[in-house]
Amino acid sequence: MGRKKFEAFGFVCLISLLLLFNSLWLASSNMEGDALHSLRANLVDPNNVLQSWDPTLVNPCTWFHVTCNNENSVIRVDLGNADLSGQLVPQLGQLKNLQYLELYSNNITGPVPSDLGNLTNLVSLDLYLNSFTGPIPDSLGKLFKLRFLRLNNNSLTGPIPMSLTNIMTLQVLDLSNNRLSGSVPDNGSFSLFTPISFANNLDLCGPVTSRPCPGSPPFSPPPPFIPPPIVPTPGGYSATGAIAGGVAAGAALLFAAPALAFAWWRRRKPQEFFFDVPAEEDPEVHLGQLKRFSLRELQVATDSFSNKNILGRGGFGKVYKGRLADGTLVAVKRLKEERTPGGELQFQTEVEMISMAVHRNLLRLRGFCMTPTERLLVYPYMANGSVASCLRERPPSQLPLAWSIRQQIALGSARGLSYLHDHCDPKIIHRDVKAANILLDEEFEAVVGDFGLARLMDYKDTHVTTAVRGTIGHIAPEYLSTGKSSEKTDVFGYGIMLLELITGQRAFDLARLANDDDVMLLDWVKGLLKEKKLEMLVDPDLQSNYTEAEVEQLIQVALLCTQSSPMERPKMSEVVRMLEGDGLAEKWDEWQKVEVLRQEVELSSHPTSDWILDSTDNLHAMELSGPR
């Protein structure tokens, strides 16, 4: 018997190693993952913005600042304003389906890789406000889908490639504030652009710069104006009247000259042209209780979106702390979003939908801002941060969350999610329930945040709505395997969040390997329960200031919520009732009986293979007592 157990243990270890190496291979063998890993290795990241770019996190589509389409192929890399330095890598050219490369406002140096010309699906290339040097690659002229090209405020040198004039889709061009030289093309797509696109390049020449190129004939000035001779009229004007009339005519001509010049420019150029200018400030309007802020108002509130005001970063964008003119503190979420025709109306519709989800345990949307270049959401500022920060990032001066507060958080967040599922029309699926997305107000009441953003983000193809996002440990099995989410996906995430509340630990933590423990919080908890070590899984910060029976009850709810089959998980409304003391004992007893029967069937089917255990099986052996 001992030999059997040893062999079974060895087989389980072998299977575990194979699964681990398989998951690593899936990420490392992914060409796109390799390319992004090369980029991360070549960049200096003082703020750990790229911390989630880990090969153990399934694939690049689960990493922050990366967006994928339905086929789990990278379509967007958003690393703007991230304080990154270092150089880009040629491997970026392997991201064949990439549409948006956002690297603006960093400290990146070196050349712009010519391999970016292989990104034939690229729509937007934003490299402005860096320290790039060298020429603009001629290969960028192969990007025939490019609409936005911003290379301004760098140290680029050499001529403007003529190949860029072949990009007929180009709508926004900014090459200003560089060290470019030579003639500015004025044919093809470049006929659309005005001098502002090329400003502050002292060695550029050509008609658009008002500086003739060497060897070219000077620009012909307009012919001088010769006033017609003054002919006395029959009525006779005095000399004073003639002089006054001449002065008036001259003044009129002086004021009309700019208008005439602009009219000449419009006749010379096509009627419609584009260039990058600061976004127009929207008029302040109210949609019910929802306020529409101007961009300028939010820029002032956040000190121009200063890094020092960043509260957090996520897959939807960055969150900034801000102070409005009346002194009110707010949290401003700056979304990353694809601009599509009709997107403004869609955005406003979805914003209004989110604003109608009003509940004590939901983060209330206070307002929004929409401009041609920005989408922002304004929320009340939550002084106590998130549950995750209170559990794992609290300063020594801050007391740990008491057990009673943790129970209050469990019930409040369940009520908020239940409202999203059962009382919103259409229902809202959160898709990313975890401790980091549960905020705490001044009274430590749980407030569910980031709901509705998956619908709000107006992407044609995005992992936010149809493919896996987030990190291992929070993701329901069916979501991980199919990319399809449901309200039961939220239930699973909620169950993991309960385990975070109880243990104070992360849902996925490689540091647990140091003690030969499971990296997945769910498996780690189950292992301790099977060994009847309940006291070892409770957060040490509680220092035994909890009731064991209440901990057992919360664990039971968590295990019911994290069953592998979504059909067997309770609805959030049922979870609320169980936490309120209604029906947990019956639900737990019923579930245990089903588990016993299922295991008996499995053992009869595999009489010599007692090692075949699903991660959700054999939980009756934990011998958790029922609610008391």
UniProtKB/Swiss-Prot annotation:
Residues 30-241 are extracellular. Its EC number is 2.7.11.1. Keywords: ATP-binding, Cell membrane, Disulfide bond, Glycoprotein, Kinase, Leucine-rich repeat, Lipid-binding, Membrane, Nucleotide-binding, Phosphoprotein, Receptor, Repeat, Serine/threonine-protein kinase, Signal, Transferase, Transmembrane, Transmembrane helix. GO terms for molecular function: ATP binding; lipid binding; protein serine kinase activity; protein serine/threonine kinase activity; receptor serine/threonine kinase binding; signaling receptor binding. The active site is at D432 (proton acceptor). Pfam families: LRR_1, LRRNT_2, PK_Tyr_Ser-Thr. Residues 56-58 are annotated as: CLE44 binding. The modification Phosphotyrosine is found at Y479. The modification Phosphoserine is found at S386, S389, S481, S486, S604, S625. Residues 45-85 are annotated as: PSKR1 binding. Brassinolide binds at F64, H65. Its main location: membrane. Residues 305-592 form the Protein kinase domain. It is found in: Cell membrane. Autophosphorylated. One of its GO terms (cellular component) is nucleus. Disruption phenotype: No visible phenotype. Serk1 and serk2 double mutants are completely male sterile due to a failure in tapetum specification. InterPro entries: Kinase-like_dom_sf, Leu-rich_rpt, LRR_dom_sf, LRR_N_plant-typ, Prot_kinase_dom, Protein_kinase_ATP_BS, Ser-Thr/Tyr_kinase_cat_dom, Ser/Thr_kinase_AS. Homo- and heterodimer. Component of the SERK1 signaling complex, composed of KAPP, CDC48A, GRF6 or GRF7, SERK1, SERK2, SERK3/BAK1 and BRI1. Bind to BRI1 in a brassinolide-dependent manner. Heterodimer with PSKR1. Interacts with the EF-Tu receptor EFR and FLS2 in a specific ligand-induced manner. Interacts with ERECTA in a EPF2-induced manner. Interacts with ERL1 in a EPF1-induced manner. Interacts with TMM. In the presence of the signal peptide RGF1, interacts with RGI3/RGFR1 and RGI4/RGFR2/SKM2. Binds to the peptide CLE44 in the presence of TDR. Belongs to the protein kinase superfamily. Ser/Thr protein kinase family. Serine/threonine-kinase involved in brassinosteroid-dependent and -independent signaling pathways. Acts redundantly with SERK1 as a control point for sporophytic development controlling male gametophyte production. Serves as coreceptor to small peptide (e.g. RGF1 and CLE44) signaling. Involved in the perception of phytosulfokine and subsequent signal transduction. This is Somatic embryogenesis receptor kinase 2. It comes from Arabidopsis thaliana. The lineage of its organism: Eukaryota, Viridiplantae, Streptophyta, Embryophyta, Tracheophyta.
